Amino acid sequence: MTTIIFLFSITIAVAVVLGLAAHALPNRTSDSEKSSPYECGFDPLNSARLPFSFRFFLVAILFLLFDLEIALLFPLPAASLITPPSTLIPISMVFMVILTLGLVFEWINGGLEWAE
């Protein structure tokens, strides 16, 4: 119990010292050159805040979801050594049907088309 109290008091002391040091140190003002983007010594050609394509975002999310689902299929051959086929085959078929229905749904809604 004394070890916990000792570690807790050291943690509080370090937090107090860091807080006092943050208030004691002078505030540094930033100038325009420090806050401007650096691009290999040249002035930036375009704005750094370009709008992001929502279509690209959706395709990236779809890729991650399908990639995760495919990664969940990898342990099925190893599970066939432990689980009887009468249990494993229906589970894997349900999983494949869900994966296929998701693909068909995205295909019908146009989520896989890059250009309109």
UniProtKB/Swiss-Prot annotation:
Pfam families: Oxidored_q4. The lineage of its organism: Eukaryota, Metazoa, Echinodermata, Eleutherozoa, Echinozoa. Belongs to the complex I subunit 3 family. Core subunit of the mitochondrial membrane respiratory chain NADH dehydrogenase (Complex I) that is believed to belong to the minimal assembly required for catalysis. Complex I functions in the transfer of electrons from NADH to the respiratory chain. The immediate electron acceptor for the enzyme is believed to be ubiquinone. Keywords: Electron transport, Membrane, Mitochondrion, NAD, Respiratory chain, Translocase, Transmembrane, Transmembrane helix, Transport, Ubiquinone. It catalyses: a ubiquinone + NADH + 5 H(+)(in) = a ubiquinol + NAD(+) + 4 H(+)(out). One of its GO terms (molecular function) is NADH dehydrogenase (ubiquinone) activity. It comes from Strongylocentrotus purpuratus. The keyword Transcription regulation does not apply. This is NADH-ubiquinone oxidoreductase chain 3. Its EC number is 7.1.1.2. The chain crosses the membrane at residues 4-24, 56-76, 88-108. It is found in: Mitochondrion membrane. Its main location: mitochondrion. It is a multi-pass membrane protein. GO terms for cellular component: mitochondrial membrane; respiratory chain complex I. Gene3D superfamilies: NADH:ubiquinone/plastoquinone oxidoreductase, chain 3. It is an enzyme of class 7 (translocase).
